[in-house]
């Protein structure tokens, strides 16, 4: 059994397996689970955040275990870290503590309707139980009370990417991105390797997307040599964000003032429902003479 958070050590109460999540049994305020995605209406190629959130009136949570996995069918998925901090909230006039207990990034590679079937989770609560030890006498011990809840199903509809307006250089990325270029401080010397950092970032998934064509931004006498990539994903304001950082190595063949051209990246914006293009601002660099920079005072050797 896969553990999502802390491991449950001792069980003293075991309820019926996987109640369908509900907010009340009679008049008693009880825990319940919600499943959600950040966009129920999406487009083909979009990456969604699927979250399972526990709402409980009791903050003394000992741990959470995964009983059965959610079923996403053929959708590409990757589990991400869940939350560990409780937040206070209110539902229907009742006070609850909420926490995201499971999270996935889902890729909508195909258009159409997709049903995301919820998994089952075991929630453990810390309890103090009165005991009468034959040696120590009356007292209290800590135990764990357990309840199992299942997440409800969620339906997502993915619209196809439009053919109209699709550019020839469409990257396949879905989101909203921008491109920036920066040159590290320091002299750039003719004939020596120099560095340029291109950053592609924004809302959406860049994990499987080809990087923009950086080489074309370097015109003679600037010579592109190599590039290394670093990709990161994060969640910001409920949206999936990505960053692709490209460190480029280049050499200027002679001294002078030169321009590194704009770098462009085409993508589909699901909010405007249009193909758009991000483009960096051209960067001007000053290249110093190699012979001047290498001049140095004489070295004296005692003999």
Where do the language-model regions lie?
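Accessible peptide chain termini
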Residues: 1-2, 303
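Sec-dependent signal peptide recognition
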Residues: 2-11
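Hydrophobic h-region of N-terminal signal peptides that target proteins for export
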Residues: 12-21
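Surface-exposed interaction/ligand-binding surfaces
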Residues: 21-303
